[in-house]
Amino acid sequence: MNGGICSTCGLPKELCICEEVAKEQQRINVNVNRRRYGKEVTVIDGLDPSDIDLQELTKFLKGKLACGGTVKGSSIELQGDHRDRVKELLTKKGYSLDNIN
């Protein structure tokens, strides 16, 4: 059974800090693009999908921002201009503000 042990560091899931280390090392870019009909989309790039569960992070952001969104490749797309609020929410999730552009 491998349910309680981290596959990266070999420690029990309760003691594993792999995700926190990964959060501190990410260089995240938050941009707003215009799409069809002038709709704005906030794009979050620079996240490593092997270290962080992008689906879980997207679900968290969509719930807090009350907007639609999706994961495309290694980036997250959210409907609307949410640059400032996304930066605030990512810092609350444990990402370093210095690494968010």
From Swiss-Prot:
The keyword Protein biosynthesis applies. InterPro entries: DENR/SUI1_TIF (IPR050318), SUI1 (IPR001950), SUI1_arc (IPR022851), SUI1_arc_bac (IPR005872), SUI1_dom_sf (IPR036877). GO terms for molecular function: mRNA binding; translation initiation factor activity. Keywords: Protein biosynthesis, Translation regulation. Pfam families: SUI1. CDD domains: YciH_like. GO terms for biological process: formation of translation preinitiation complex; regulation of translation; translation reinitiation. The keyword Repeat does not apply. Belongs to the SUI1 family. This is Protein translation factor SUI1 homolog. It comes from Methanosphaerula palustris (strain ATCC BAA-1556 / DSM 19958 / E1-9c).
